[in-house]
């Protein structure tokens, strides 16, 4: 059994380099919610040095709210914003001698694309135009995954170790109580359930079927490092190989 472990980096966190020793894929902020040309370049250099898969982490243009504010942006504008961000990171990766492997939207762009077909299509079309070899990472079972599949893109279905799920398979919004799992033990148990049994318990007690290609851990805070180490130990104990998807 193989699983990819990814983290969102280049967002101003202090633990980026240390996390790169534990994850197999890195999603690098492209400047719209966090980061700039220099942080993108540094993240790429670190990622190449540690041999992780390099991915773009594009967002709505929302630095004030860290990309976590819902926005009503026309599909054609989202398409242009995606091409802009992917183009910038692709150029930096090429300049450093690396290869961009995947794209994972950030924050509300990710969450809205999970439910909104037109937005999902705009993102998938931008990825295909920039580089049809790029893999599109999205919430397991989401509209974004379906949009990528319709266009013939390789997709990677993502699950979250420390987030709670609604009965429809989407994430409990961060604005609601109970959105996050604060117990490492519960987060580890949920992760194993998703990988080994392809299901997750929703907040109403029902089971939701999920495909787990890659697991996200959040890179902010010292706790992220401790949890990443626990996750790697848990995978080793259960004979789960960690490798880039």
Swiss-Prot record:
This chain belongs to which protein, by name?
Answer: 5-oxoprolinase subunit A
Which SUPFAM superfamilies does the entry mention?
A: Glycoside hydrolase/deacetylase (SSF88713)
Establish whether keyword Manganese is in the entry. Answer: no
The biological process GO terms on file are: carbohydrate metabolic process
* GO MF assignments: 5-oxoprolinase (ATP-hydrolyzing) activity; ATP binding
Q: Which family does it belong to?
A: Belongs to the LamB/PxpA family.
| Main function | Catalyzes the cleavage of 5-oxoproline to form L-glutamate coupled to the hydrolysis of ATP to ADP and inorganic phosphate.
Q: Which PANTHER family match?
A: 5-OXOPROLINASE SUBUNIT A, UNCHARACTERIZED PROTEIN YBGL-RELATED
- List the catalytic activities from the record: 5-oxo-L-proline + ATP + 2 H2O = L-glutamate + ADP + phosphate + H(+)
Q: Recall the taxonomic lineage recorded for the source organism.
A: Bacteria, Pseudomonadati, Pseudomonadota, Gammaproteobacteria, Enterobacterales
Organism listed in the record = Pectobacterium carotovorum subsp. carotovorum (strain PC1)
């Amino acid at each position: 059994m193989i699983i990819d472990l990814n983290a969102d980096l280049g967002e101003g966190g202090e633990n980026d380099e240390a996390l790169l020793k534990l994850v197999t894929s890195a999603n690098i902020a492209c400047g719209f919610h966090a980061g700039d040309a220099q942080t993108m370049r540094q993240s790429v250099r670190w990622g190449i040095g540690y041999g992780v898969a390099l991915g773009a982490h594009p967002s709505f243009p929302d630095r004030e709210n860290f990309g976590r504010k819902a926005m009503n942006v026309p599909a054609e504008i989202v398409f242009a914003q995606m091409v802009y961000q992917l183009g910038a990171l692709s150029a930096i990766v090429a300049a450093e001698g690396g290869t961009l492997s995947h794209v994972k939207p950030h924050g509300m762009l990710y969450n809205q694309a999970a439910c909104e077909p037109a937005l999902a299509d705009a993102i998938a079309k931008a990825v295909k135009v920039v580089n049809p070899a790029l893999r599109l990472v999205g919430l397991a079972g989401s509209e974004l995954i379906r949009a990528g599949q319709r266009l013939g893109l390789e997709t990677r279905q993502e699950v979250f170790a420390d987030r709670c799920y609604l009965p429809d398979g989407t994430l409990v919004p961060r604005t609601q109580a109970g959105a996050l799992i604060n117990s490492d033990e519960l987060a580890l148990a949920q992760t194993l359930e998703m990988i080994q049994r392809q299901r997750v318990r929703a907040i109403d007690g029902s089971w939701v079927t999920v495909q787990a290609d890659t697991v996200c851990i959040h890179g902010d805070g010292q706790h992220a490092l401790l949890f990443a180490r626990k996750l790697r130990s848990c995978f080793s104990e259960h004979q789960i190989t960690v490798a880039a998807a």
